[in-house]
Amino acid sequence: MKIVTVEFVKSATLPSGYPPGSLPEVAFVGRSNVGKSSLINTLLRRKQLARTSNTPGRTQLINFFNVNQELLFVDLPGYGFARVPEAVKREWGPMIETYLRDRECLRMVVFILDIRRDPSQEDLALKGWLDYYGRRTLFVLTKSDKLSRGESKRRQRSVQESLALPEMPLIFSAKTGLGRERILEEIRKAKGEARS
């Protein structure tokens, strides 16, 4: 999948603010600070399209990006960061759940985890929730450049076991671009499939 054009469409919190739903969508979800924005920017070959930050919990809206006029990338707020005010956390849960549960044009969820960390209780809960709603999910382990190749493989197997995944999660590095083409290929395949 070749990225030709990318444009920011809008931010929203409620379904009434979402784009029309005429294009297939791929959503990106994960804990705060797992490298979600860096993954999106690397996939799209844009430096600051999705805002990266050293402050976890920066993304507090659902952000929609039009890719090639043929699909939307949807950047969902990161979850699980302690220093985010409790009132904000209470809004995030329903906002993310409503989008993931109800969005008809959602073709795939890219579930992002830091390769150096074990899945949290929140990760396990979200995975169970996505399974329950039958959402096609691609698991991606970021920050692989922080580990040796052997350690990356070991962590890949460990996360697969922890989440009881039928296939190995993909390994990705924003720094080296490792995994970029494979992730884009999975997105391309999902884009063409209607939700079953």
Swiss-Prot record:
CDD domains listed in its UniProt record: YihA_EngB (cd01876)
Protein name: Probable GTP-binding protein EngB
GO MF, any single term: metal ion binding
One GO term describing the cellular component: cytosol
Location of the EngB-type G domain: 22-193
Binding site for GTP: 30-37, 57-61, 75-78, 142-145, 172-174
Cofactor: Mg(2+)
InterPro entries listed in its UniProt record: G_ENGB_dom, GTP-bd, GTP-bd_ribosome_bio_YsxC, P-loop_NTPase
Domain of life: Bacteria
Family: Belongs to the TRAFAC class TrmE-Era-EngA-EngB-Septin-like GTPase superfamily. EngB GTPase family.
GO biological process: division septum assembly
